[in-house]
């Protein structure tokens, strides 16, 4: 249900394509496809991509699973016009490195930066290496990359065993 709500928020913000980075079982890309997005799923784990392919064939909903390293993937091949990128991973658990790389790739594609949205999964749970938890732990990256926060939606999802509260999803765009 949370993946559907996130995809619906992105739809209401006017995005046309959905790219789920570190997609796991593909639920966000799947929900995007149901909502008529041109969806793409990028996952490095071949077992999870096989699961996604099974879901696509069993449901007749092709959300374009790709078994690839998101850091190396050539996003220009997708011919994106107005995409929203969902970045898997928490900022303090390596997600910031992934997000920084994806942002650089977005910036390298002409005319894509100003039409792109990025959604981050946040956390309100303090961890050993976590710093500022504003904007779900993403505030430094948001400031460094000149992103505007459009909306924050807290949904009943749990990323780790020590987080027993809702997960904030931070919807951003370039300034």
Language-model segments: which ranges?
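S-adenosyl-L-methionine
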Residues: 1-13, 53-80
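Short alpha-helix immediately C-terminal to the canonical SAM-binding loop
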Residues: 49-50
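C-terminal substrate-binding/active-site "lid" region of AdoMet-derived donor-dependent transferases
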Residues: 96-166
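Conserved class I S-adenosyl-L-methionine
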Residues: 15-24
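Conserved SAM-binding motif I beta-strand of class I
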Residues: 38-43
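Glycine-rich SAM-binding Motif I of class I
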Residues: 26-30
């Amino acid at each position: 249900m949370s993946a559907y709500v996130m995809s619906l928020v992105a739809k209401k913000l006017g995005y046309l394509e959905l790219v789920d980075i570190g997609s796991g079982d593909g639920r966000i890309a799947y929900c995007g496809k149901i909502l008529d997005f041109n969806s793409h799923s990028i996952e490095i784990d071949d077992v999870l991509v096989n699961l996604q392919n099974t879901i696509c064939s069993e449901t007749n909903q092709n959300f374009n699973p790709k078994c690839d390293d998101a850091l190396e993937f050539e996003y220009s091949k997708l011919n994106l016009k107005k995409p929203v990128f969902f970045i898997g991973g928490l900022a303090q658990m390596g997600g910031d490195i992934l997000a920084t790389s994806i942002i650089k790739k977005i910036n390298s594609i002409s005319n894509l930066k100003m039409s792109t949205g990025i959604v981050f999964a946040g956390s309100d749970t303090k961890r050993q290496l976590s710093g500022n938890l504003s904007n779900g732990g993403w505030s430094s990256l948001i400031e460094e990359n000149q992103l505007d926060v459009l909306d924050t939606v807290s949904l009943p999802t749990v990323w780790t065993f020590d987080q027993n509260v809702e997960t904030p999803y931070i919807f951003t765009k370039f300034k």
